[in-house]
Amino acid sequence: FFSSRSRHTRLLTVTGVQTCALPIFRRAKARGARVTAEATPHHLALTDECLATYDTNFKMNPPLRTEEDRQALIEALRDGTLDCIGTDHAPHTDYEKDKEFDFAPNGILGLETALPVCLEVLVKQNKFKLAHVIDLMTRRAADILKLPAGTLAPGAAADLCLFDPAEKWTYDAKDGFSKSSNSPWTGQTLTGRVRLTAVDGRVVFEDGKILR
């Protein structure tokens, strides 16, 4: 799958890796191939059992898999086979999603729920260190994309996110900041909420309000 040229060519796999590909990535990394891959919050949290009702807000690509697959992705994050967490944020209109399951488009919202979902699945349920999860969602992704972000090092831009890891709140996509509402977490109680966001030192979001 990966030739010797992979050491000189970088490959980034996005939108989540399927479990069957994990051994390939492990072998490639062991050979020194420059390959990186991400996991998504929804593939870490949900399984194909969610599809029983044919709710199109659970339709995505790659599709949801079994509980065994979900656990394999979590362990791949733990051992470094998977390099970072990406939201695969894919908004769609209500009109697009309000179709028969086979005809509705793939994709769900991911930005507003990524943090609480990862805190629940990785930190609370699977005993990841909080600092590790933050690193997977910030610095690791920035490093892969060669972006000067994801760090609080001297001289770095003050791009900050302050959150309360213990705050419980009920998510409703209709009240969210996206123009779309295709989220599988609508109506669910989540734990962990962003309270403030700063971009280059300027506060742009605080206590549920966009300031600029």
PLM region descriptions:
Residues 57, 78, 83-85, 90-166:
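His/Asp/Glu-enriched, well-ordered alpha-helical/loop segment
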Residues 17-85:
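Histidine/acidic residue-rich metal-binding segments in metalloenzymes
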Residues 58-68, 107-110, 183-189:
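A short acidic, glycine-rich active-site loop
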Residues 100-103, 157-209:
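C-terminal cap of metal-dependent C-N hydrolases
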Residues 3, 141-142, 186-189:
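Short loop/turn motifs at secondary-structure junctions and domain boundaries
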Residues 8-9, 17, 42-43, 89-92:
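Histidine-centered active-site/metal-ligand motif
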Residues 1-20:
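Single conserved hydrophobic/aromatic residue that forms the stacking wall/gate
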Residues 11, 38, 88, 118, ...:
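Residue-level signal for inorganic ion chemistry
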